[in-house]
């Protein structure tokens, strides 16, 4: 890709700008531009799309997104050390890359973007799950984004696509599968990164559905699954008792045995419970 965009290899960029990854920022840099291009392609045809990227670091994925035709990339970067490297990419792609220095958890990107919008990111490990839950649980749906193409630790990716009954099934699976079509599209070994993490990574592609699979208030559903899976080995009548004094009756009304555990309950039943809880007098 260096020959295409006229920019130097990422190892050279990192050395020149002293961009050693910081553990406290959850950084692991992907240096193979062939892999970053592959991740960009996993997001689909980016022509005519605005793209949000969180934690671009030295800009490997940023370059992939721009080379694959993204109309405009909004890169949100907390680490000030990366800004000069990203500015060089912006110069190579005039008018197509906007960099915001700040925390993605505190920034509203919508003022900077024009639909259609996609989110593509090698998320910092320490904020990835929190960002995903925010993107999955807005009050209004469809959301501002068409799709999410996100890299996580492989264990987290497997939790997003997990089915009831297994150890991986939990809050992420329920929230993701309620409103999106989610699938793992790539796995990457530790040695693909600098520094190499201790675990494999995976890219998950989530496409927003036109509407949720079953009706439920997102805040209530999030509260139900958070409580249920926070104490996943407990029976639901115990793990959810803090949500409502008549939780056993609400479970039965939703078709759920009060003695069941969260990992045994499917999406439809969780949504039924959330509806019942929202409608129940306190």
Swiss-Prot record:
Family indicated by similarity: Belongs to the class I-like SAM-binding methyltransferase superfamily. rRNA adenine N(6)-methyltransferase family. RsmA subfamily.
HAMAP family on file: 16SrRNA_methyltr_A
Organism: Paracoccus denitrificans (strain Pd 1222)
Keywords from the named record: Cytoplasm, Methyltransferase, RNA-binding, rRNA processing, S-adenosyl-L-methionine, Transferase
Name by which UniProt lists this protein: Ribosomal RNA small subunit methyltransferase A
Gene3D superfamilies tied to this protein: Ribosomal RNA adenine dimethylase-like, domain 2, Vaccinia Virus protein VP39
A single GO cellular-component term on record: cytosol
Enzyme Commission number: 2.1.1.182
């Amino acid at each position: 890709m260096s020959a295409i965009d006229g920019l130097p290899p990422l190892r050279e960029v990192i050395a020149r700008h002293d961009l050693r990854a910081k553990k406290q920022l959850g950084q692991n840099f992907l240096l193979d531009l062939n892999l970053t291009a592959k991740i960009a392609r996993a997001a689909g045809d980016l022509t005519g799309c605005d793209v949000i990227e969180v934690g671009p670091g030295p800009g490997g994925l940023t370059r992939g997104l721009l080379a694959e035709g993204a109309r405009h990339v909004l890169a949100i970067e907390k680490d000030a050390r990366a800004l000069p490297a990203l500015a060089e990419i912006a110069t190579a792609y005039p008018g197509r890359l906007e960099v915001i220095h700040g925390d993605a958890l505190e920034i509203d990107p919508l003022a900077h973007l024009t639909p259609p919008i996609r989110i593509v990111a090698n998320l910092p490990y320490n904020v990835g799950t929190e960002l995903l839950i925010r993107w999955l649980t807005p009050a209004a749906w469809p959301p501002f984004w068409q799709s999410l193409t996100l890299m996580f630790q492989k264990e987290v990716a497997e939790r997003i696509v997990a089915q009831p009954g297994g150890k991986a099934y939990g809050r992420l699976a329920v929230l993701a599968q309620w409103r999106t079509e989610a699938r793992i599209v790539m796995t990457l070994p530790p040695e693909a990164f600098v520094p190499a993490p201790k675990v494999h990574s995976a890219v998950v592609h989530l496409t927003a559905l036109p509407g949720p699979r079953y009706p439920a208030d997102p805040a209530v559903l999030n509260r139900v699954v958070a409580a249920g899976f926070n104490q996943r080995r407990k029976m639901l009548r115990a793990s959810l008792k803090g949500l409502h004094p008549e939780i056993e009756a609400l479970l039965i009304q939703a078709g759920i045995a009060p003695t069941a555990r969260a990992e045994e309950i499917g999406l439809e039943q969780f949504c039924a419970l959330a509806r019942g809880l929202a409608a129940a007098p306190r």
